[in-house]
Amino acid sequence: MRIALIAHDNKKDELLHFIKRYEHVLATHTLCATNSTGRLIAENTNLMVHRYQSGPLGGDQQIGSEIATGNVDFVFFLRDPLTAQPHEPDITALLRICDVHNIPVATNFATAEILVESVL
């Protein structure tokens, strides 16, 4: 499976905790991430992660393009619902493209765990 990993700044620690918990599962899949999320994963795990631009610099749109062309099967996008994001239109577009292409997307830890436990 090809999995995209994205986290807002206030959720990066939560995503890293999730990734470390399931590193043995994720290691068998192809991973991509926005830049700072990918760097965090690379620095703290043994996982190989293809990194796109930072979300606000177009990374969300790059991952959206990968979804649209059939190159992503799952998205783990831990969003911070309590902080306004300057690139909110990009985030909305990414979530929309997931819906258009019927791509499972987890926007919180509980949903991410359910996806990993039941599908991966």
From Swiss-Prot:
Keywords: Lyase. Its EC number is 4.2.3.3. Pfam families: MGS. It catalyses: dihydroxyacetone phosphate = methylglyoxal + phosphate. GO terms for cellular component: cytosol. GO terms for molecular function: methylglyoxal synthase activity. Substrate binds at H8, K12, S54, G55, H87. Residues 1-120 form the MGS-like domain. InterPro entries: Methylgl_synth, Methylglyoxal_synth_AS, MGS-like_dom, MGS-like_dom_sf. CDD domains: MGS. The keyword Lyase applies. Coiled coil: none annotated. The active site is at D60. It comes from the Bacteria. The keyword Lyase applies. GO terms for biological process: methylglyoxal biosynthetic process. PANTHER family: METHYLGLYOXAL SYNTHASE. NCBIfam families: MGSA, PRK05234.1. Catalyzes the formation of methylglyoxal from dihydroxyacetone phosphate. Belongs to the methylglyoxal synthase family. This is Methylglyoxal synthase. It comes from Natranaerobius thermophilus (strain ATCC BAA-1301 / DSM 18059 / JW/NM-WN-LF).
